[in-house]
């Protein structure tokens, strides 16, 4: 993954998203997960590129989410991200609350997947999300514009 990260950067990427190794995480090989995260985040930092670590929360237990947040708190990627949007579930309020509580303010959170309306987007922001990934972003902005006109 580190070589792929460097290749993407050399080909013009200014942000890198990568999914943690779920097999190693499920095996509780947290040392491996931390080393991989560190290698990718440091490669991004060296080239002034944003790093986003995707948890894919829909496949994780509460314990695994907490462990990943603790690792991220040490490694300091620019963002942690709830999901790719391709898994069995997207961002939930519960997950975002847990991530923010465990991380503190040291790492930004991107909520992705399942955010389809203004109310949900605003609630995510209230919970501490810095970015939202949504295929409904245009509809959400249009809803905000209409709300502000009223």
Predicted regions and their residues:
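Alpha/beta enzyme core
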Residues: 1-109, 117-142, 147-150
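Short hydrophobic "strand-cap" motifs at the C-terminus of beta-strands
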Residues: 112
